[in-house]
Design a protein with these regions (language model features):
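Glycine-rich phosphate-binding segment of PLP-dependent enzymes
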Residues: 43-62, 76, 81
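Conserved N-terminal alpha-helix of the aminotransferase class I/II PLP-enzyme fold
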Residues: 62-95
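PLP-dependent class I/II
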Residues: 2, 6, 10-12, 17, ...
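Generic structural signal for well-ordered alpha-helical scaffold segments
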Residues: 22, 76, 80, 106-107
């Protein structure tokens, strides 16, 4: 009964674990959740007011499928001001979240058998979306001892005549890694050499620490920009995950037109009032965003300090987003709380059932020796949860 293309697609473990954790809390379990990939802050008041006012002004009807012109213009201005990228409103598609933008891209650019380079560890939906579009994910393992740096020799070996695109995610979910300008430039050069499209997921661009700055790979040259599709959105930066507004930009009119056509036959336009709210979001002072980023940085420092105190766990310092990706391989093969730890699913199940802590198993991101912790939660929760993890792993 089910289409073959969906039989090879697994469910989102991150959403599944978050749903289970929320149900346990609803059932009265004293649970600490590190699974959710969304800010725990409220949407800023000015943005909420813009959405409310849009509804009161009856901004409740269809818009063009690719988004309202005013929001496209605001996105184009954002790219120019913040990323040094010149796009026309006609180069931009507004979608129902950055995840939707990515889905649209793969559906638009992939033919059966086309390969897509995905750096591993990777965000859970990249590989599944590529498979839905009848593409083939090709994984390139990042070098953990070198802070999840790219192995360019390995990358070159993975590129074939079937390779159509590569995905660049900076800052990274799940590792928090931020590739250097030199690494991004090398990636851009390789993409030009092999005539590959670059899908650049920049959704966490404003959540960067240690004084580092975000660089869009599309900004290196006109040639690189011409082969890059930039994806972003308002969800993570402005605590608007439920508003469902993402966007993409590309110089390639054929790709943009194809995505516009696809979206017109699937979701049509994103919700009208949330598009209006997104315009206000893009006008929000940087000080508001920086206040949230500063709080995330404090939590990042705390979670690293607490992990430092748990023997057997190691990690690479995250420089962006709000995740950390501890390596627990020293526990593999051991029995903890009556459960043999063969991989990350075993560890996550043990922590959930015995310690009442929800984490995301690393296998969801292509790395079975790790688990992901989101520090988009309170300092008190971080301390409470790490107390429980430390006790469980004694």
């Amino acid at each position: 009964m089910i289409a073959e293309r969906l039989k090879k697609v697994g469910p989102s473990l991150t959403l599944a674990i978050d749903a289970k954790a929320k149900q346990m809390i609803k059932d009265g379990v004293d649970l600490v959740g590190f699974g959710v990939g969304e800010p725990d802050f409220n949407t800023p008041e000015n943005i909420k007011e813009a959405g409310i006012n849009a509804i009161k002004a009856n901004k409740t009807r269809y818009t063009p499928a690719s988004g309202i012109p005013e929001l496209k213009a605001a996105v184009a201005e954002k790219f120019k001001k913040e990323n040094g990228l010149e796009y026309k409103p006609s180069d931009i598609i507004i979608s129902c979240g950055a995840k939707h933008s990515l889905y649209n891209i793969f559906m638009a650019i992939l033919n059966p058998g086309n390969e897509v380079i995905i750096f591993s560890p990777y965000w859970v939906s990249y590989a599944e979306q590529v498979k839905i579009a009848d593409g083939v994910p090709v994984f390139v393992q990042l070098d953990e001892p070198r802070n999840f740096e790219i192995d360019f020799n390995l990358l070159e070996k993975k590129i074939t005549k079937k390779t159509k695109a590569m995905i660049v995610n900076s800052p990274s979910n799940p590792t928090g890694a931020v590739p250097s300008a030199d690494s991004l430039k090398k990636l851009a050069d390789i993409a030009l050499k092999h005539k590959l499209l670059i899908v650049s997921d920049e959704i966490y661009e404003k959540l960067i620490y240690n004084g580092k700055k975000h660089i869009s790979i599309a900004s290196f040259s006109k040639e690189v920009k011409a082969q890059t599709i930039v994806v972003n959105g308002v969800s993570k930066t402005y605590a608007m995950t439920g508003w469902r507004i993402g966007y993409l930009a590309s110089d390639n009119k054929e790709i943009v037109s194809a995505i516009d056509n696809l979206q017109s036959h699937s979701t049509s336009n994103p919700a009208t009032m949330t598009q209006v709210a997104a315009i206000e979001a893009l006008k929000t002072p940087d000080s508001v965003v920086q206040a949230m980023a500063s709080e995330f940085d404090k939590r990042r420092q705390l979670i690293m300090k607490r992990l430092d105190g748990i023997p057997g766990l190691t990690y690479v310092e995250p420089e962006g987003a709000f995740y950390i990706f501890p390596n627990f391989s020293s526990f593999t093969g051991k029995t903890i709380k009556g459960r043999k730890i063969k991989g990350s699913l075993d560890l996550a199940e043990m922590l959930l059932n015995e310690a009442k802590v929800a984490v995301v198993p690393g296998i969801a991101f292509g790395s079975d020796n790790h688990f992901r912790l989101s520090y988009a939660t309170s300092m008190a929760n971080i301390d409470k949860g790490l107390d429980r993890i430390a006790e469980a792993l004694k």
